[in-house]
């Protein structure tokens, strides 16, 4: 029994898996959630980031430098991919899907030619663990959790509170109108794709020390990335975090009692049910809010408030 009573001894792994689900889907939030590109090469950007960390580690012995260079490498390749191939395919979803699928296969084959199919290992930059309230917490897993929280907070702030975020949201919602406002839509799309690719590369580098690295590394995360973004709602960062908590938490808890294969199947079923029920839940929530707003508006003094709201500001007269 742990200090928290009802939690299993290694329940910190629940938090870690939620962070992992959030981290792997955060890059896809840009390429698929915002740009609506069914990016089947998303897993390969994690792969590129992981192998960048491995290569730098082999060349210099400095895995931290490799992790820092991983998003640079993945982001650069993301720009090249967007400018060279996807630029003309935004209105052709099937063609973009086939293009990203082909690039994913090519990337895996190139990695296998360069590094073989033999498993590789990226060192844990910190090593060791510590105990908190009876939990054995590996330092590197704590780093993953902290990095995920920081990335989500940073992305949320950038998209909600900066000029870049305003332009990005305008580009995503109405590209034609954004162009009339002087926004370079092509450049914004390239920037968003590069950011998504860079975050995926960083995710791959951060996750490499706790996984075996081989050319199939990216495929481990591809399906769950799409599940999180789809269940959370395309373009919704808050929904992404909630979906990651539901799916990652469910998978981690189920693995305590059943095999990983059956746990993943149940998570898939949860995702399907979530997508199916989400419109119904959204409609009921909207209806509840409308009734609550109406009830508040019909309270004492509501007529006076309504007249006050309709009255012209002080010093102004309607013609």
Residue ranges and their predicted role:
Residues 28-50, 91-96, 164-167, 185, ...:
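Short, non-helical or kinked segments that cap or interrupt transmembrane helices
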Residues 84, 88-161, 188-191, 288-319:
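Transmembrane helix-bundle core of multi-pass membrane transporters
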């Amino acid at each position: 029994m742990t200090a928290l009573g009802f939690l299993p001894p290694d329940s910190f792994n629940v938090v870690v898996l939620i962070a992992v689900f959030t981290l792997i889907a955060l890059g896809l939030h840009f390429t698929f959630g915002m740009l609506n590109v069914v990016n089947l090469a998303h897993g390969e950007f994690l792969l590129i980031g992981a192998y960048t960390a491995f290569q730098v580690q082999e060349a210099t012995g400095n895995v931290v430098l490799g992790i820092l260079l991983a998003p640079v490498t993945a982001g650069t390749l993301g720009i090249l991919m967007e400018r060279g191939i996807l630029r003309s395919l935004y209105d052709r979803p099937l063609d973009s899907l086939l293009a990203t699928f082909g690039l994913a296969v090519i990337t895996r084959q190139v990695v296998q030619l360069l590094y073989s199919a033999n498993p590789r290992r990226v060192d844990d930059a910190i090593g060791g663990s510590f105990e908190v309230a009876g939990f054995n917490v590996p330092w590197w897993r704590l780093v993953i959790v902290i990095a995920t929280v920081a990335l989500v907070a940073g992305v949320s702030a950038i998209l909600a509170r900066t000029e870049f975020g305003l332009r990005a949201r305008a580009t995503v919602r109405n590209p034609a109108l954004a162009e009339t406002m002087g926004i370079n839509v092509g450049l914004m799309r390239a920037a968003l794709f590069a950011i998504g690719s860079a975050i995926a590369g960083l995710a791959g580098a951060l996750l490499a020390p706790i996984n075996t690295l081989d050319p199939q590394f990216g495929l481990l995360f591809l399906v769950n990335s799409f599940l999180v973004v789809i269940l959370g709602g395309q373009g919704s960062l808050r929904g992404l975090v909630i979906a990651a908590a539901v799916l990652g938490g469910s998978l981690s808890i189920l693995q305590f009692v059943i095999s990983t294969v059956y746990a993943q199947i149940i998570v898939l079923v949860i995702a399907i049910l979530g997508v199916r029920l989400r419109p119904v839940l959204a409609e009921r929530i909207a209806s509840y809010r409308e009734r609550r707003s109406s009830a508040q508006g019909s309270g004492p003094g509501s007529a006076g408030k309504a007249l006050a709201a309709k009255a012209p500001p002080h010093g102004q007269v309607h013609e």
